[in-house]
Amino acid sequence: MKSDTIKRGIQRAPHRSLLARCGLTDDDFEKPFIGIANSYTDIVPGHIHLRELAEAVKEGVNAAGGVAFEFNTMAICDGIAMNHDGMKYSLASREIVADTVESMAMAHALDGLVLLPTCDKIVPGMLMAAARLDIPAIVVTGGPMLPGEFKGRKVDLINVYEGVGTVSAGEMSEDELEELERCACPGPRSCAGLFTANTMACLTEALGMSLPGCATAHAVSSRKRQIARLSGKRIVEMVQENLKPTMIMSQEAFENAVMVDLALGGSTNTTLHIPAIAAEIDGLNINLDLFDELSRVIPHIASISPAGEHMMLDLDRAGGIPAVLKTLEDHINRECVTCTGRTVQENIENVKVGHRDVIRPLDSPVHSEGGLAILRGNLAPRGSVVKQGAVAEDMMVHEGPAKVFNSEDECMEAIFGGRIDEGDVIVIRYEGPKGGPGMREMLNPTSAIAGMGLERVALITDGRFSGGTRGPCVGHVSPEAMEDGPLAAVNDGDIIRIDIPSRKLEVDLSPREIEERLQSAVKPRRSVKGWLARYRKLAGSADTGAVLR
C-alpha cells in the first residue's frame, strides 16, 4: 500500500506516534488509508450538508476495513460571487482545489480518495486532482436542491436573476420579486436546474467516477446518504483492486461524457472543465473539435432548465444518467470500465427510462443536434461556444450592430440605462482568463436581457456564462482581447453575424482592418495582486480549458 510509506519500519516510528495521537490503534496500521476530501462550508448552500455525507462515507470506509481521514478544501458559490470582483476568483479556484487535494494526498501518502464536491469549480478541481494523483478515487457529488414554486410554476435561482430585469422593465413589482426571492431556493444544495454544478455531476457519473444514480440523487433523499456510504465501501475495494482514475477516465470515457453533455444540453463551462481534466492525463485529446464533431451527431434529448421547463428532479425521476446512457447506447463506448468495477454496458443492462417526455427517444429529440455548438470565424479563430439548445429558433442566425463594452460593469450600466436596442449585438471584452483576470461569468447581463424581454439581442464575450444562461450568448471567444484577439478590434456599429447552424462568428471587417485596429487598440489597465496576479501570468486560453501553464 502507498500508505506503507508513512507507517512501515523503524524509521517511521515518529510517523506512527503522530498518527496514534489521531486515534489510530495498532490494527489500523494494517488497513488502507482513505482520504475524504470534503469541500464543506456554511456560506455555500451547495456545500452546507457535506459534513453529513462525509460521515456516511466514513461509515462505509470503516465497514469495509479502511481507515478514513477527512480533510477540507475551499468552495466558492458562483451565485454569491456573481457580478462583483469575487467572480474573478471563481474559475481560478478550480486550480486551488486541485492543488490542495493533490497536496494533502501526497503529503500523507493516502491509498485512496473519496471526493465530496457539489458546485461549479469544485467538481472539476477534484477530478483534476484525481487524474493527477492517479490513486484509486471515487466522487460523491452533493446533489441538487428541490425546485421552488412561484404562482403555481416551478422556479429556480435563474428566475430570480431574470426577475431583476423584469422589475426594471416594469413587468414585475418589487414585492413580487421579493416573494420569488424567498421561494425560488426552498433549501440548500446545488441549484435545481441543469446549470454548471449539476452538469458536472452528471458528467462525473458519465465518466464512470461516481456510482450510478449519484448525480441526480437529490441531497434531501436518503438515497444520497446510501450512495455516500456505498462509495466509502467501494473505495476500499478499489484500493484492493488497484483500480485507478486513469483506468476509468480514458479517451473513450471522456467521449461518453461529452455525448451526455450534448444530449442534456449542459453548461458551456464543460468546454473548459472537461479538457482541463483530460489535460492531467497523458495521451488524451479532448478539445473543442471533439465537442463540435459530436454535437452534429448526438441530438439534444432533454429540455431541462434553463433550456426548458423540466428540473433535475424530473431527470432523476426519469432514471437519471443511467437512463440517458441507455438512450445513447448505440453511440457511447459501452466497454469503458467504471468505478463500480463493471463496464458501462453492465451498469446499464437492466436500466429502464421512466419518463420519455423528460428523456426523449433519439428519433424524437428536442433538437436534432447537441445542446452546445462551437463557432469559429474572424472573431473567434480558435473557437467560441454557445448553448444552442437554449437559443430560440429565430435567433439561430442573427446579424446586428455591435455595442462594445470593455467590462461587464460597463455593460450592466448600459442595459439598465436603456441604451440597448432590439437587434444589437452586445460585445463584452477584456473579461477572459488574463483580461478579467479570471474569466467572469456574464449571468447578470444575460439575465437582465432576458428579464427585460429583449428577445432579439445577442451577446458575445471572451468571458464565460453561467450554466443558467439562455439565449444567443456566445462565450469563450478565443483568443481573448487581452491577448490581441480580434474582439479587441470591434467598434460600436460594426456589423456582427452569428450563424449557429453554419458554426460561424464573424465581423464585417477585412483582415487588414482587423490588424490595423489591433495595432492601435488600447488595453485597459487592471491592477490586481496576490493570487489573481499569479493567475493572470499563468492562465492559458479558454479554448484549451484555461489551465495554468
UniProtKB/Swiss-Prot annotation:
- One GO cellular component, as annotated: cytosol
What is the UniProt remark on how the cofactor binds and its stoichiometry? Binds 1 [2Fe-2S] cluster per subunit. This cluster acts as a Lewis acid cofactor.
The cross-references to Pfam families, in alphabetical order and at most eight, read:
ILV_EDD_C, ILVD_EDD_N
Asked if the record carries the keyword Transport, the reply is: no
One annotated GO molecular function: magnesium ion binding
Q: Where, per the database record, does this protein carry N6-carboxylysine?
A: K121
User: Mind listing the UniProt keywords for this protein, alphabetically?
Assistant: 2Fe-2S, Amino-acid biosynthesis, Branched-chain amino acid biosynthesis, Iron, Iron-sulfur, Lyase, Magnesium, Metal-binding
Concerning InterPro entries, the annotation shows: Dihydro-acid_dehy_C, DihydroxyA_deHydtase, DiOHA_6PGluconate_deHydtase_CS, ILV_EDD_C, ILV_EDD_N, IlvD/EDD_N
The annotated active site, in chain numbering, is: S466
A GO BP annotation: isoleucine biosynthetic process
Residues annotated for Mg(2+) binding in this entry:
D78, D120, K121, E441
Protein function: Functions in the biosynthesis of branched-chain amino acids. Catalyzes the dehydration of (2R,3R)-2,3-dihydroxy-3-methylpentanoate (2,3-dihydroxy-3-methylvalerate) into 2-oxo-3-methylpentanoate (2-oxo-3-methylvalerate) and of (2R)-2,3-dihydroxy-3-methylbutanoate (2,3-dihydroxyisovalerate) into 2-oxo-3-methylbutanoate (2-oxoisovalerate), the penultimate precursor to L-isoleucine and L-valine, respectively.
User: Which family, according to the similarity comment?
Assistant: Belongs to the IlvD/Edd family.
Q: What is this protein called?
A: Dihydroxy-acid dehydratase
Originating species: Methanothermobacter thermautotrophicus (strain ATCC 29096 / DSM 1053 / JCM 10044 / NBRC 100330 / Delta H) (Methanobacterium thermoautotrophicum)
Name of encoding gene: ilvD
